Amino acid sequence: MTKNLLVELGLEELPAYVVTPSEKQLGEKMAAFLKENRLSFEAIQTFSTPRRLAVRVTGLSDKQSDLTEDFKGPAKKIALDSDGNFTKAAQGFVRGKGLTVEDIEFREIKGEEYVYVTKEEVGQAVEAIVPGVVDVLKSLTFPVSMHWAGNSFEYIRPVHTLTVLLDEQEFDLDFLDIKGGRVSRGHRFLGKETKIQSALSYEEDLRKQFVIADPCEREQMIVDQIKKIEAKHGVRIEIDADLLNEVLNLVEYPTAFMGSFDAKYLEVPEEVLVTSMKEHQRYFVVRDQDGKLLPNFISVRNGNAERLKNVIKGNEKVLVARLEDGEFFWREDQKLVISDLVEKLNNVTFHEKIGSLREHMIRTGQITVLLAEKAGLSVDETVDLARAAAIYKFDLLTGMVGEFDELQGIMGEKYTLLAGETPAVAAAIREHYMPTSAEGELPESKVGAVLAIADKLDTILSFFSVGLIPSGSNDPYALRRATQGVVRILDAFGWHIAMDELIDSLYALKFDSLTYENKAEVMDFIKARVDKMMGSTPKDIKEAVLAGSNFVVADMLEAASALVEVSKEEDFKPSVESLSRAFNLAEKAEGVATVDSALFENDQEKALAEAVETLVLSGPASQQLKQLFALSPVIDAFFENTMVMAEDQAVRQNRLAILSQLTKKAAKFACFNQINTK
């Protein structure tokens, strides 16, 4: 006979961003708890609102499964003394298992007998295991936590109720001084405390108190309500997925409504209006059928439709205050002079150990000079790049960005266009922040891409130079994201810029404000981001490519893909093994690897030397790999007919030199001795 278990934790209002991850974590930890305790179940469903986390287990076994375990002990010769009595070693072993020597049996393993005991544990009734759910709740982890009253245990928010039901049976458990039972809380204003009748009646019992416990149902309610408003007014409403997820975690009983604002505010840049609505007020944006922004918004209240007109008026009033600010800053910022703002950046600290934002811009400008040539920018693009690099942070001192920091770069583009700068300069100022997340949008223009790389490289090198290097999960200056951005942009544009050579060039630059250091650490840091870009590529292939001598990001990613592509083919293993053997022996070469044909003693070493001399890796990675694999028969013939480590030192070094020259060329693709062929 199966049962159903419900566990609900009632809390103070949770931050919206915590709700969904905590709900998921609760479900995962409950499943692990049941598995650990040998309790089978049919399904686990989780619930969450801003004021509760809950999980329900259906089809739960009414008792633990019985457990039978075999334990191996000491060898028989150690377990028995010369008189055939059990030694202290054997007695201690069985005592540790809660058994006696009478439970011992001997089993033979590879010709030798060992002590074995079998321990049987009869499963307990589920009622005896349920109290352990308190430990599940205590094990939840959160990005922030607090303690309250006299309680030293830290948790995300103060706990108010604990509901634990096994079908209709309630459990009087204790969690942070809160007694468990069947009482739960309804909606803060529309509902009241209520008794949950059974584990299966949970949603309906709360629904009567204006709480929709299932987040999926709550989300669907919001979407359906928005769709009805769309149909009624003939408009298009942008249902942003992230905003929707945030809103559903702010309400327990959602009611969507449409408000409006004066059309005069539409003269302000759309980005300002959208930011005011989405980021600051959690409103959905409304457009006409052609995509034009309308003076309306959609909000979702935490409650029903009663007195909705008052709610709409209140939301409109709050939004207008935001829009007034935006309109004011838009008007006043146009009076500012870009060159004046750039000069004032001398007084804005980039970081106290590094210098000002203006100094950061100057260094970035120097880096763009190097990158422009390597990226093959035209004369016009180079001119636009130089201008963009000279002013690209100015908008940080505008009133608009001071109020709406999400608009940095975006407002820079707007203001530079108004000031008569070229569209390319304006676009680069917006694009230099890209990507803003791991999968974020990349710059579209070459000028913007180069400026983005230069800005990020100076940031990375500057922080490394003063010892502010990410460790573990700690990355307060988002250097991993910046590095990932550099790698992604280089790959997307296919620029053949060798990162090691570029970093060497940057270290050669001497600035009055900063001298770069920590080159090796920077290179390893960048390689780690390339590693991440390789995704699910097998670890050994990643290591082979990363250990190679070609540090062009696009080439490295292409090489890894090519190796994965051919790794299942018949000639992969023997070809890699041939190259790997060459790599291992080449490490023994001394000094400069020069080959003297006069020292050849057989045709096979001559053939390999000639093949290596004429080898020029070219074309796509798949073609280069074919070129290398085509050498496999020549390499094998060389090894079969040649004693590489000959007694004659000159002959030995000559043969090692052949292998050294081979591996030097092959290493531009990958270090093949890092690939596992077993």
From Swiss-Prot:
Q: Which reaction does it catalyse?
A: tRNA(Gly) + glycine + ATP = glycyl-tRNA(Gly) + AMP + diphosphate
Q: Which GO terms describe its biological process?
A: arginyl-tRNA aminoacylation; glycyl-tRNA aminoacylation
Where is this protein localized, as stated in its record? Cytoplasm
Q: Which EC numbers characterise this protein's activity in its record? A: 6.1.1.14
Q: Which InterPro entries match?
A: DALR_anticod-bd, Gly-tRNA-synth_bsu, Gly-tRNA-synth_heterodimer
Annotated GO molecular function terms are: arginine-tRNA ligase activity; ATP binding; glycine-tRNA ligase activity
Q: Please verify whether the record's keywords include Kinase.
A: no
Keywords from the named record: Aminoacyl-tRNA synthetase, ATP-binding, Cytoplasm, Ligase, Nucleotide-binding, Protein biosynthesis
Specify whether Protein biosynthesis is a keyword of the entry.
yes
What are the record's GO terms for cellular component? Answer: cytosol
- Where does it mainly reside? cytoplasm
Taxonomic superkingdom: Bacteria
Q: What is the enzyme's main class?
A: ligase
User: Which family is it part of?
Assistant: Belongs to the class-II aminoacyl-tRNA synthetase family.
**PANTHER family noted in UniProt:** GLYCINE--TRNA LIGASE, CHLOROPLASTIC_MITOCHONDRIAL 2 (PTHR30075:SF2), GLYCYL-TRNA SYNTHETASE (PTHR30075)
Quaternary state and interactors = Tetramer of two alpha and two beta subunits.
The name of this protein is Glycine--tRNA ligase beta subunit
